[in-house]
Structures are given as structure tokens and as C-alpha cells.
């Protein structure tokens, strides 16, 4: 292709994207086809990767194809393993793409499609992808060191020490939440559990095939693995229909929680080429395959975006799906769909230890985040093609809308979104569920959206239930890969912390030390997971509200670290690349964090619903009222009921108090990183650059 034709092609892509983007932003009144959103997103991602991604890669970071990576220098066949670019892309994408891009945009859709679309597209290209890419780069230049360890090396021991503890706490919360989503999806689901279980032996076979049987034959292993995965999905439905096998593969949530912990431990201590990398690569086939099929199906089916462009009546935070104003909580709620701190832990965890060539970081780091942003766009479409009345029926709590279909329809219609009981019951029957009312959390909405789109092309109404349950399975597989990779990254983090106490424990090549660190990691997130599995109001459910804020604070810290390193590298003129998104993320997140620790304010329902401190006051008063009531009744049945209510209120009080304390601690850690960044950038704090010595790649031969 000639230079002129290339320029014409990119001009066409840019023009097409701008037209579709502008149409979505400016259209008023009439419904808009989802095709415009798909086309706008694809064009923006193409432009972002080709121009901005390459600018960051070769102007800002100056990637060097001749520089040896830690995977080559430290190759130990377990954690440090040079990995094919396509396989590593699959591993990294599977590891970072958890519940966030599926759930966040669906919840944020209550504000309308335009605010979410703007942040997912702009934030994904200019903030999230840059964040992932730059952290992967700086970790690769530092022997694959973890985020906390790099903050300690580059920004000071005290700041780094506090940050390491905060990052570890955030990591435990994130992994436990991801694991709980998987447990909820697979509990009582023999089809899903069988299919997920089968990906393990398939991945092990692929790992052995690519390393010993046919070294380097990634294409062959990919075809075999993909065929076996499709067979596993098919026979999962056969297993579910068989009474004997269905019973074997039907597990309750507490049992599944234990299985998840065992799997997380084993996957984290085995050599990365044996299970983790091939399984993530295999999962990526399904993940990207479903997203591509969804995009094509949307173009063919052309569903309308029925959600209004902007639900301005909920911008003040009074929306029924989540409390909090459009600023800052839209950004915090969307989270991973635009930028995620969890990605920094993977980009400084497993991935830099597997990067075969430094130039691969562009595709692996920047490209993977754009792929995740595309997932977020698909999730947003799944929510917005629903009738708004159905959307709110699914995502509003039963305490707000009730449980009777007629009353639910009346309540939601009174909000201005007309819906009939028949529309609710018809959809419920079509997807084979008992009810769709108050199926909060985002996952059911995504599955319904997938079913509504795909049944138009494959099978009609008769197969809507199949596509719905397939989407639930897809979500479980989508999220599980983030759990095993997250646990491995958490192990590196624990070893960094233990290494400050006893140096041999910090050696990641030390197998016994790795086993101890993995056990501590799994015990940490596993405790919260198991408690949540046996008590729907305990364990990780207590810490769930902290996910969004803590995750975004982590992203802000990572971007400030990157800014500091750019200054030390003599690239201060390029610091806007990381500093601008850091400021945007931290202003929104710290403002949200402050709102979460504000005291109770009489008559301010939105502020009180957001604040953990206000919730503590509300629950304390509730406990006092219940205790007074308890002391003035003699009815045994009523006494039992009141005691139960006191127990629940006490649990809520303790949970919110813990959230408030952790929120303050995370903000303090973030402020320390901000202060250190400012001090270093202004030359007030002198800490030398800790980049590893340059070693030419031709000194090593891939093992």
C-alpha cells in the first residue's frame, strides 16, 4: 500500500469515526442505532493505537527492540519465561479483563448512554491504555518488579512502604470480589462448572504442546485448543441435562469458594507456561470471539439504543441503580472500562516477566486495554438496547421497586419510563428465568442484552434461554482468568513485603518462599470470599463498596510513579502523557473518597447514601431504636425478630466503619505518593533512577 493510499485510508477512518461520534452526541429525541456506537468505537480505537499508542511507544518511551527483557535475562522456566507475543497478549488481556468492563458500564447506563460512552472511549485511549502500557514498560526496565516495590525504589522508602501495604489491601479486595462473581455465576450451574473445569486440562495440554511436543507452533496449539473449548461448551449442556452428571457438577457457593482457593493456589505456584499462560490465551479466544460476534451481530441486527442520551434527572445522584452524582461516581463506577489500577498490578506482575521483546509492550499493554474498553462498549450497548423500564426493573433494588410485577411496573412508569407487567413477564419467560426483578450487579443485564441480540440471528425466540445462559457462562470464564493471574501477582507483592523483614523470603526464584507467599495471598482473599459465600451480608460483601474508589486510587498512584520516572529519564516535556490522566483520575477519585467519609447530614439522602461515616451514624441510631423497642416488648416472636434486625444493623455498622477507615488509609497512601511525585518533579527530593543495566538481546538465546 502506497503512502498516499495509507493516508487516505486513515483519513477515511478518522472521518467515519468523527461522523458517528458526533451523531451520537448531537442526536436528540429519536432513538439511535447501536451501529453508530460500534463504528465510532472501532474507528477511535484504530486511530488511538496507530497514532497515539505509537507516539507513546517510540517518542515518549523509546522502546528498544535490541534491549534484553527480564524474561530473557532471568529465565527460570517458572515465572520468567519468554513468551510468544500473541500468547502473551492473550494472557494479559485475560488477566486484566475481569468483572469491571462488564458490570461498570451497565450500572453507569442509568445516567444515559452519552456520559458513559465519552469516558469509555476517551478515557480508554488517553488514560487506561497509556496507564497499562507505561507501567508494563517501567516494570520491564526493572526486572519485572511490582508496583509497590517500584514506588519504594523511585519515590522513597516510607512512601513506598505505606503504598505497598495499601496496594496489598486493595489487591485482596479486588481478587475476592472477582472470585465472588465467579462463585455466584457457577453455583448450582453444572453446565458452567463443567466447561470452566475442562479449560484446565485443555490449557495444560496446550502448554505442553507448545513447549515440548511442537515448540513454537502457536497456531497449531490454538486450533486444537479452540476446537476442544467448543466441545467443552457443547458437552457442558449435555452434562447439565443428565441427572447423574448434573448432580456431580452442581456445587453450592461455600464449596465453590474452597475450590476457587485451591485453584488459585495451584495455578499460582505452577510454572507460568504450564497452566496460567495457555489457559488465559485459550480464554481469550472465547472472550474476543464473543465480542467480535457481538459487534458483527449489532451491525446486522441494528438494535436501537432505547436508553436516553442523558438521564439528567439522575445526575444529582438520586438514581435507583447506584447513589452518587454523575461527577465523580460515573467515572468511579465505570472503572475498568476506561482505566483500572488492577491492571497496573498485572502489568508489574506476571506480564513483564514474560515479555519476549520490549517492542511487544505496545500490543500487549496498550492493545489489551483497548480490547477491554471494547468489551465495556459492548456491555454499555447490552444495557442501552433494553427498554429503560426493563433496565430499571432488573437493576433497581427490591426495597425500592418491590417484588410484585404489577407494582414494579407502576413504580417504574411513575419515574417516566413506561413499562407493563406483560413486558416483564414475557422477557422473563423467554430467557428461562423465574424472575428478572432486582437482578442487580450488572451480569444478568449483560446476559439479557446478549440474548436479545444473538437470538435475532441464531435460533429466534426459542434459543433466547440458551444464549442467556451461554452469556452467564461467558462472564464466569471472563472473570476467572483475572483471579489466577491476580493471585500470582499478589504472591510477588507479598514476597516484596516479606523481603523487607527477611531477605530470602523476597527472592521470587525461591520456591519455598513462593509457596509461603502464595498461601498467605490465598488465605487473605479466600477468607473474605468464604465469609461472603456463607453469609450474603458478610465477608467480601462488606468491602464491596470500596472497589471502585480503591481501584481508581491505585491507577492514580501508578500514573504518578510513571510521571516521576519520565522526569528522571529526562523526558519532562512528555510528562503530560501520564500527568493529565493522573490528575483527572485522582481529582474524581479523591473527591469521591472524601464524600465517602463525610458525616451524616440531615435531609441529604444522596450524601448519606454515599458516605460510610453517615451510614455508621444511621445504623447506630437504628440499633438504639431497636434496643429501646426490645426492652419494651414481651412477645417472644417479636423479640426474636428484633434481635435479628439488631444483628444485621450491627454488621452493617461494623462494615461501614471498616470501609471508612480503609478509605482514609488508601487516601493517605495516595496523598503520600502525590507529595513525593511533586517533590521529585520539582527537584526537592533527590532519588536516582533505578533502571536496570542495558543488556543487548543478542547475548541471550531463548530457551
What are these regions (language model features)?
Residues 298-314, 370-448, 485, 530-538:
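Extracellular/periplasmic helix-exit of transmembrane alpha-helices
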Residues 53-81, 107, 117, 121, ...:
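Flexible loop linkers connecting adjacent transmembrane helices
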Residues 1-15, 47-102, 284, 325, ...:
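Membrane-interface "cap" regions at the ends of multi-pass membrane proteins
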Residues 154-172, 367-374, 440-442, 461-471, ...:
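Loop-to-transmembrane helix boundary motifs in multi-pass membrane proteins
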Residues 22-28, 32-33, 79-142, 153-157, ...:
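Membrane-interface helix-loop-helix modules in multi-pass membrane proteins
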Residues 31-50, 108-139, 148, 193-199, ...:
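Extracellular loop-to-transmembrane helix junctions
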Residues 35-42, 47, 51-60, 166, ...:
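Membrane-interface loop-to-helix entry segments
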Residues 18-31, 100-102, 114, 172-188, ...:
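Transmembrane helix-loop junctions in multi-pass membrane proteins
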